[in-house]
Every structure is written in structure tokens, then in C-alpha cells.
């Protein structure tokens, strides 16, 4: 009798232990999947931001307008901050990557200090222009090396969790493609010889990367490839490489890339709805045949093909025969700054060369926009009378607390300087004043 009782107790214990062990394994596996997805996201964003950084530095070199150069430097500074943040989220603690981080800090420090000074009174010196050219060449080299690592990683399905293991084993490091690639990047930066130990490290902020407002049904891998072929205008599916984020990802994605002769492309596509979130095509530009205005019409058509309707052109620029267009969502006449997208169009043939819809899909939603409690004239009364107002719009912006507020947006000129002024449409308070050389005014002296 006691024998059968003992057997029963032991059986229950064994089963209980097995269940506990399985649950422990499942939890650890979920954690690993989540970590792998975060590493993948950070790496692909780092590669993407390095592409943009190189492009924006090239844009700055091509500019001839001091008024537009300062905001361009602010954009470059922000990109270095974002790239720096992504580096910090990769498992590179055991891999010397300090010089690359310092390189990003140097660019950020240089562009920030340049952006906040008056370039009319103190324009770029020949030495500073040469430094900017050096940054352009060097960032281009890093961009190409990261793209090569990315291509191999996607082709071979490499995992970042393996990088962590390799970094703790000197022998394994020699056989890890990702580790070797980052060591190549670090050696390249070391050869630049420009790191300045006195420069401060750029502070970074953690951002919410969840895409809460994606719509549509989930697309299969084959459907994603077909969609990518249409977007990239590629007829041979075998040219495309695709990888899928793990099940633990906050936002399941397909990462799709291709290399064709001297042309390279990369895209992040949301599994839900098949929406392209980031897209970049790099190729040699030919003779310009499309005007900047014609390019904006093509950009709007591209947005419509992706289901992004009611978008209003906010600003545009041109460099190296590429048109860069920023659009805001127009909600029944109200410009929504958080629902912004950027499109790049080749002005040689009108091809789509770049797309960023992150902000749109992170923020876009059906809003119940209240009626303004003050009139536009009352809002104008809260703007300095010496400001010559040129344009006005209703706009939704984020205030200092990160909350969306309805405002009257005024574009005006004072002392030959252009300002964008946002007045709260409920209480008439000033929410934000921007000087359009990129410097934000944080005080009320213009009121």
C-alpha cells in the first residue's frame, strides 16, 4: 500500500518538476526573443540613421543659404543623437566601440555649436567647411560598412544573441560576422584621427518605438516580398532578402533588402497591414529632369499609394538631384505635426528613394479636435505687434508635457528673422516659438 502511495507521490513530483522546468524554459525563451528583437531593431535603426546622417551632411555642404544651414545642422545633431542612442542599445559592452561613439559625439557637438550661433555674423570658416567635408566622407565610409554587415546578417540570418556569446569568447569572436564588421568600423574611425576627448558625449533619450496605430490584416512573407517588388520596382524576387522579427517583438516587422549592381535598398515593413515604415534606396544619380515641384507631386502620389491620404506639404529641399519632402497630416484643416512623414524622390527619373513613416504610425489616430475657444484675431493679439504675420494655420503640436494641444500657428517676420509662433487655441498662452534658423526661443520676450 505504502509502495503505491510513494509511487503516486513521486509521479506527481516528477510531473510538477517537468511543468515547472518547461515554464522556466518558456519564460527564458520569451526573454531571449524579446532581447533579440530589440537588438535587431537597434541595429537596423543605427544603419538607417547613418544613411540619413551622411545624406544630411551632404545636404549641408550643398546649401548656399545661411538661413537654411542652421536648421540643417540641428537635423544632423538630432540624427547623431539617435544613432548614438542605438549604439548604446546594442550588446557591444565587451567590444571596444568608443571611437565610433566619440565620432558621433564630435559631429553632434560641431553641428550643435554651429547651429546656435549667428551664421550671418560668424559664417563657417574654411577650416570648418573642410571639417564638414571630412565628416561627410567618413560617415559615408561607416554607412557603407554597416550596410555590408546588415546585408550579410540578413542573408545568413545572423542573431545578435550569438554576438553576446562571441564577445565573451575570444576564439568565437574571430568567426562572428557582426563582431568582425563592427571591429572594421571601429578601425576605420580610428584611422580618421579626429576624435576630440574634450567634446561632451551627446545625451540621448529613450523613445517609444511602438506602432500602436497600424491598420489592416497581417501579410505573409510571400505577400511582403510581392509588395517590396512593387515598391522597389524589382522583377526578380531572388534579388530580395527578407527576415522576420521574432514573436516577442513589440511590433512584428519584415526587414527586406536587395543589392543590384550599384543599387542597394532596404525597407522595414510592418507585418500588420504591410505598411512600409522605413525605406532607403542608394544609387548613382543621373541628370536632373524633374523639378522640385514636380517631385513633390510624385511624393504625394507615393504617399497615396501607401494609403496615406490628406497629407499637406510642409517643407521641401533639394540636394544631389534628390528632392526631400516633409508632409503633415491635414485633419479637416488642422495640421498635425506629430503625424509627419518624409519622402525622398530622385529628380532624375522620379523614383522613390526614401520614406520615413515612423512618426505617423506611432501617433496617427482618429482625434476629436475641439473647437477653438478663442478666435484667430484674439490669438494674434498675443503675438508681438512687431512681428509681421505672413501665414496662419490651425495646428496640433506636442507641448512640453508631451500632450497634444490645439494651437494657432503663425509664421511671421521680425527684424529680418522668420519665426513660427504657436498660440494655445483654448487659453491664448504661448506654447512654442521657433526661430526658423533652427533655434528654439524658450522665453516670452517676443510677446
UniProtKB/Swiss-Prot annotation:
UniProt entry keywords in alphabetical sequence: Germination, Sporulation
Pfam families tied to this protein: PepSY (PF03413), YPEB_N (PF20769), YPEB_PepSY1-2 (PF14620)
Organism superkingdom: Bacteria
Classification via InterPro entries: PepSY (IPR025711), YpeB_N (IPR048402), YpeB_PepSY1-2 (IPR014239)
GO biological process: spore germination; sporulation resulting in formation of a cellular spore
Family: Belongs to the YpeB family.
Described purpose of this protein according to its UniProt entry: Required for spore cortex hydrolysis during germination. Appears to be required for either expression, localization, activation or function of SleB.
Name of this protein: Sporulation protein YpeB
Gene source species: Oceanobacillus iheyensis (strain DSM 14371 / CIP 107618 / JCM 11309 / KCTC 3954 / HTE831)
Lineage: Bacteria, Bacillati, Bacillota, Bacilli, Bacillales
Amino acid at each position: 500500500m505504502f509502495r503505491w502511495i510513494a509511487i503516486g507521490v513521486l509521479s506527481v513530483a516528477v510531473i510538477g518538476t517537468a511543468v515547472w522546468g518547461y515554464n522556466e524554459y518558456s519564460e527564458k525563451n520569451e526573454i531571449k526573443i524579446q532581447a533579440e528583437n530589440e537588438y535587431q531593431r537597434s541595429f537596423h535603426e543605427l544603419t538607417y540613421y547613418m544613411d540619413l546622417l551622411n545624406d544630411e551632411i551632404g545636404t549641408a555642404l550643398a546649401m548656399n543659404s545661411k538661413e537654411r544651414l542652421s536648421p540643417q545642422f540641428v537635423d544632423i545633431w538630432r540624427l547623431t543623437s539617435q544613432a548614438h542612442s542605438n549604439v548604446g542599445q546594442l550588446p557591444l559592452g565587451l567590444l571596444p566601440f568608443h571611437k565610433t561613439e566619440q565620432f558621433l559625439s564630435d559631429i553632434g557637438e560641431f553641428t550643435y555649436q554651429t547651429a546656435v550661433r549667428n551664421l550671418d555674423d560668424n559664417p563657417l570658416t574654411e577650416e570648418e567647411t573642410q571639417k564638414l567635408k571630412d565628416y561627410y566622407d567618413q560617415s559615408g565610409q561607416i554607412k557603407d560598412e554597416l550596410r555590408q554587415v546588415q546585408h550579410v546578417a540578413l542573408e545568413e540570418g545572423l542573431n545578435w544573441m550569438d554576438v553576446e556569446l562571441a564577445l565573451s569568447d575570444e576564439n568565437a569572436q574571430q568567426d562572428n560576422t557582426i563582431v568582425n564588421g563592427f571591429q572594421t568600423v571601429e578601425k576605420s574611425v580610428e584611422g580618421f584621427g579626429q576624435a576630440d576627448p574634450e567634446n561632451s558625449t551627446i545625451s540621448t533619450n529613450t523613445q517609444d518605438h511602438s506602432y500602436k496605430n497600424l491598420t489592416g490584416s497581417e501579410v505573409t512573407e510571400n505577400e511582403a516580398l510581392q509588395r517590396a517588388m512593387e515598391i522597389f520596382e524589382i522583377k526578380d524576387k531572388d534579388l530580395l532578402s527578407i527576415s522576420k522579427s521574432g514573436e516577442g517583438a513589440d511590433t512584428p516587422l519584415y526587414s527586406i533588402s536587395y543589392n543590384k549592381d550599384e543599387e542597394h535598398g532596404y525597407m522595414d515593413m510592418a507585418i500588420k497591414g504591410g505598411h512600409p515604415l522605413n525605406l532607403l534606396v542608394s544609387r548613382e544619380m543621373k541628370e536632373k529632369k524633374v523639378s522640385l515641384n514636380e517631385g513633390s507631386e510624385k511624393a504625394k502620389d507615393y504617399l497615396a499609394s501607401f494609403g496615406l491620404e490628406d497629407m499637406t506639404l510642409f517643407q521641401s529641399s533639394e540636394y544631389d538631384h534628390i528632392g526631400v519632402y516633409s508632409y503633415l497630416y491635414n485633419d479637416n484643416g488642422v495640421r498635425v505635426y506629430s503625424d509627419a512623414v518624409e519622402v525622398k524622390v530622385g529628380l532624375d527619373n522620379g523614383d522613390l528613394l526614401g520614406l520615413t513613416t515612423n512618426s505617423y504610425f506611432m501617433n496617427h489616430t482618429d482625434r476629436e479636435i475641439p473647437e477653438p475657444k478663442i478666435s484667430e484675431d484674439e490669438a494674434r493679439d498675443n503675438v508681438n505687434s512687431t512681428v509681421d504675420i505672413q501665414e496662419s494655420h490651425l495646428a496640433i503640436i506636442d507641448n512640453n508635457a508631451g500632450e497634444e494641444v490645439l494651437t494657432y500657428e503663425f509664421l511671421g517676420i521680425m527684424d529680418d528673422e522668420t519665426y513660427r509662433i504657436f498660440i494655445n487655441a483654448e487659453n491664448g498662452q504661448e506654447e512654442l516659438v521657433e526661430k526658423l534658423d533652427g533655434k528654439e526661443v524658450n522665453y516670452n520676450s517676443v510677446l
